[in-house]
Amino acid sequence: MKRSPLSLLVAAAFSFACCTPIAACEQQSADCSELGVNSSNAPTSTNAQSTNIVVLIDLPNNTQDTIDKVINQVYNTIEHQLDGITEFSLTAGVYTGQSNNVTTVTCMDGTARSFTYVEGENNETRQKRERKEYFDSTKKQLENTLATSTHNKSTSGDFRSLLSWSKDKITQNNTGNTKVILWSNFLSNGTDCLNIESPSSGSSALADEIAQRCQDADLLPTLGNIDVQVLGSGYGTDTSLASFSSQLATAFCKRISTNCRVSQGK
């Protein structure tokens, strides 16, 4: 169909305004990559005032109910841990059972960010607004990552790839104030120490036996005394496994870190 001169003029103006091809212009919506990183007061990896949050999500499936549960629990925890804190870095990895691959969430890559108000150097209202924009944007990015993840049910519930992946992230951004949020229901179909033949007959004793088996075989990555909060325990599409899920979380938590706690979240 032949386009009118007016339509061509409008298209050209739109492309010029974007300084990129028209197709690329559509992708330049809200971008969280620069929020909090332009300030001369941005925190560094050696800044003890900066908090480093590492989010690890072992997603059992990507139904909307599961995604909503994960997003609500994770962000309630992040907001609680960063309440009143304006200098921090957020790192997030998602594992869905695809080999050992962990997907890093856009704008949650460990970049140090500062939303600190400094009199005479920046605007307090803008700092607060950008901090909120950053959280809102990363929340959407995380939701999109979870919704588009491809799952391998044969290895679901194996959170260990996330723990191994997190070690490098913790080292890179270690400020002395690192907190790890691990979301998993621990209901694994693994073939090694995590193999659970009859989860329906699970018990605290069996959960402890499985966790110890992994530890004895040196198949359980540990995080020393890093602050670790476990979410997702008791969650599953099979409600009969809820109790065993919680028992597994408790058994593994105390072996992952000496400073680990299990929380149901909200």
Where are these regions (language model features)?
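Bacterial N-terminal signal peptides that target proteins for export
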Residues: 1-10
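Bacterial N-terminal signal peptides
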Residues: 11-20
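Bacterial signal peptide processing site
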Residues: 20, 26-28
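Von Willebrand factor
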Residues: 48-175, 179-181
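P/S/T/G-enriched low-complexity
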Residues: 51, 230-266
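Catalytic metal-binding/acid-base residues of hydrolase active sites
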Residues: 60, 186-187
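VWA/integrin I-like adhesion module and closely mimicked acidic/polar interface patches used
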Residues: 187-242
